[in-house]
């Protein structure tokens, strides 16, 4: 077997050592070594960058390939010591010539980081004698194409709480004939027994044998020129040459693109010109030169020269890269943010949340508890958790894996629960319009007064794609009471003046625009239209207007006959101007649609109420093949609104068959979600992406839409595996439904990558064409259609756009063709039936037939927030700006069927969503959402049937019709997207032009990034994204760009992004690792990361099968922590506003250090948070005293602490463990504490026995506590068991329950675990238990206690109760058996504490 020597270099930088909480002063040293699997023959060497020969204690040195940092002394707590050592590990590997790339990807590289300590400085130089006190091992997941560029803060163990900041850069730098001898692993090495020295040395193979294969015999001199090399040998040589050159070229491109991105995003770096080696061109040139040679020796020599030439380029670039980025503080900051975001995103897996009505807290939710227990078991055994990929550089001890991470369920009790993706801080709205009025979205001045006398929440707003900047902390009105007038500032500004500008631009990658020159935020003319231009749309453009945008304007008059109905209507007119009008980025300006939406508040909208002012189209200037497709929406009064079902229709009408089938396999539809509020003290929350992976609409107490069984509908015309395989999302429409239809329509879904096995034949390079220019159907046809369909609400959608992967601001075209669709299919008229109202009949969207054009079948976008996709078609996602209103979503209602599992192969003659297919069956499911119901307003977007004509063109029809000021477009289809050429950005941005909303918005994000490919440089100005970049440059989507979206800290509330389309950082990481694939793994045939893909599919499958009642934090755009530990520049604390005092109280037989880790992770997670921790120690000597005594001690301690340090207190929070929680509650009732009651903020109860230990289900623990009480004469244990008084109502705990306290907190967070047998689970959660229900003597007293405790909480307006149910991954030990392990895991499990605080818990202390 021919073998090749590959050289990989790792640059490891040790930046800073942080003393978090070390116990011992003295001398410390970090030692780092790289370990490579002994199964692969290798040679390892290490060198320190820029080191001279002299070595001293105060400089780094190398011993046997282990790097010793300089020795440093630690004297103070919170001390930061700059290390600034950089080392290069060079690994020469002997690789099989057949699968070099795979072999390199599978090498197990590990970086071992050890902490050594001694009192004697000199002892640390004694390599053998200096003791190692703690060690961590980092797994480095290296991929030869992308290299590895990552930063990890490595935290040592509990007893040595300190962090060393480590940056790793790695690249494949050489491939060549083996030049050094390698030691073969000996027998038994696969068992770990064989060391590197046990095997034999490998003899070096001759170059010819390497090139031509083992079967090659060198001709003797006598044969001379008559010797002819066999065809097999020649083929072997050419293939070998091609594979090696291709791998080196990819490695070069990956490093170069990463370098370019770094230079672009970090202005402080010196900008240098980097030589570009175009992969295909260079490869074809090298191969063609080799083809011309016939002499075997010359062929071998030429191959060697080519490899040496490419290697020299690679080495030059690598050296240049290291010289630029090594130990550069800005690069470190950039990579730190990226790592933190991915890590938090990974922690958010298997973390569920659900919202309930506040009153539900008083009920016995036995089913909920049982569901949690069953789910935790299912998750542990599910492929979802077991297939979760690792981080690019991970440490199992601190990052965990599926086997060690806890599973957490959160139940939040709020006034207006949302069963959708909204956060509790963005509650539901009632938005009926008070009087008949024309809602002209153009009128900025009008504030829309909302009369919420109905329980329906409605939005009359069409969202725009780019959420303008919004102050994420601004007030959002919570569920107005009936009869209350509400004028929502920005929300209704949206409503009153939101002009929806959708400009669909065409992007073409010109040869002159290199991959790295994606536009960086400056707005080009194309696609940006100021408000002033709106009125010009009233005139029909003449032939000379070829370059002017066409605005389609629709007024919908509303009447107030039935205020519970409001129809959003959307008109899009997508037009292309002549190709000559492209700007420097190759953009076509396309027509804009100006939509004026009015709420029609009657059961039926008649056509006379809606005037289609203009559906003007460009007469000239359209591509010769291009035709405009006008989607018109027809609203017919009088039919009851059945849940829509969208189906593909073949020439023969399938509608009738759908009538019967639609109820069978309905999937729940998803709802839109509201904007996230950052830093709010309430956890942001949103929904599971596919569950109803959706954008939660403001309109959301929605009824479920249902699709007919996709199987029945899809079989006739859907290609079975293409989309399913291709979809990063596992192919369910649910994810697509996640977007309001139009939204999806104008975005690319990542839908076109073929998956490995059955799609190999689809050349990935063809995928690049997925965004090529579509043809637009003729304006004449479109206009005719619009006229013939005098619809009540015109619905014109941009259905086609020219697009390649380069985009201009203002363009919302990200098209992604489906590689599996047939070329050149004609698309006949497509009709989509739309139910606009509960009482209304269908409307039709007509798509005139266009020759050889394609459009994406778009799902219905229901104002109630759910999108419905036509089965069998992909949908594209678009980010829309939505009034900040929240939607409800039925957890049971699933977003659509696996309609997307398959890609349309040929377009059916008719796309129809027939009204006959509608049924009421979905309504009942959703009505249980709340007492409110939302009218079923559905705004169907055009069916997106995707077909590709011969040029791979594709168009989209989309109608963003959303109602949420910052919708997350939840769950955009995360299908592997088609690769866009040249790695340029394909942004989606529309300009929403309401200045009033703009001024209050902090968000810059407006793009919907599907998978990882779309970054709107315009929406995210690059300078604001130093730390984390949205995915840019790469439009390729390797599967790792999945739902692990990340949010740059500068844009904390990325409304407008669903989890699936939130910003992805540029991770530049190996394909198999968790997170997003590098931006530069851009455009050609990047392989899909099967591991990430399978994880995503497993996750979707898990959510589907289990019908999860609740949602995953991983589907949220913004999590609790967006700032990494140890940010480079902490804001100076301004103590004028007062500090936040956090009092930590330990439990029985505990001490002040018990809550040390809790304190540590809050401090690390909230740098500059003005937090002052009081670790209570007054009771640590005697926790067996009675509660009154301990209460007095704690109260004295708190008041003394405040007075001693003269603290100006703004807020007080309490964190208690076990029995400490009772002491805290007792303190709240004391008169001396009354002054501080109005400052109470958060009460975090960790396994607190609030109801005592009366109904403990562990006999062993009960017996132990009884014995301990007898031995210690413990008053507290007596009181916990209600034996301190014969009359239960005179017991301490009962009387404590009657006193006020908990309702003064903003957040009451109860953490409990069924595995904890020290404290009964129901007691920690303050809820009823089965045994108490059966107990006629004590049960009623127990119930009274619960009501006494929770009643004031329910009545308190500003108090939120949150319960957490934690399932730890515990080893089988005696501690686990008796329940102690879980009881103390909330204190000493780093994995639980980091997961809890980073994902959700930090919000309670902000």
Swiss-Prot record:
Q: Which UniProt keywords apply?
A: Phosphoprotein
Q: Does this UniProt record's set of keywords contain Protease?
A: no
Report the family membership: Belongs to the FAM135 family.
Which portions of the chain have biased composition (kind: Polar residues)? 804-816
Q: Name one Pfam family in it.
A: DUF676
Can you name this protein? Protein FAM135B
UniProt modified residues of type Phosphoserine: 777-778
Q: Where is this region: Disordered?
A: 519-548, 770-820
- Give the gene name: FAM135B
Could you tell me the Gene Ontology terms of the biological process aspect for this record? lipid metabolic process
